[in-house]
Amino acid sequence: MDVEPLDASFGATVTGLSLASLDDATWSELYAVWLEYALLVFPGQFITVDEQNAFAARFGELEFKAAPITNIGRSGRVHFEPDDDVVKSVRGNEGWHHDSTYMPLQAKGAVFSAEIVPEGRAPTGWADMRAAYDTLDDETRRRVEGMSAYHSLFYSQDRAGYMPSKKNESGGYDQYGYHDMEPSLRPLVKVHSETGRPNLCIGRHAYGIVGMDPDESERFLDELNEWACQPPRVYFHEWEIGDAVVWDNRRLMHRATPFDMRQPRRMWHTRIAGDRQSELAVNHR
């Protein structure tokens, strides 16, 4: 196994192994590397959906098995119209976010792989919230230490203008994450359960800092997100077919980037469930 650090505060490219056939010794070494670098990029793995799920399951229980992140419908039609709910779902991911902070249980991580890649390679970006916390000025660090904010997919999609158009017979939405539970409350600074290091927990789903005027909260979170997601704390991966990655959702935010939606794109996303002891929202315990 060869590990080459990326040109960022985190991340590494890993070669010289097959994700489909890891022995226990290699797996133990790989997990330690993952905790150190938070994002591991595996070029040209060409894993199947079943192999991806099996690899992800080594990290822990799955929140859900491999799901397509795509603009290709079940009939094979490419969805590209701006008011199409498929397009809205894809475009919403262009904001920086942690996965499942809007659910009671924040995800531990995710495995992502590329099956169909459009021209321009539709990069995915990641941002290091541990390095962001470490480089906060003293005044801002003191402020955020005691703050908590709510997280909601309704909030983030509505603010971006990407709420689904279609509702079910009950008047709700069938897409994942649009639940009727109380929005999840999370501290802006979370200590990583395995490394013991503090990380910012912010992103597009966060809003309504407790005890702060809503407009002031929105401005503060926008400024914090903008500042946090800057070099050298960011990395954008330009996809090639067959690439796979795994990232630590407790440390990293991520985002999609715009691409020509008239071109097909199909990625596979397997989400790793968080530990209830550390990733359960404050108000869902």
What is the role of each PLM region?
Residues M1-A244, R250-R285:
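Non-heme Fe(II) oxygenase catalytic core, chiefly the N-lobe of the double-stranded beta-helix
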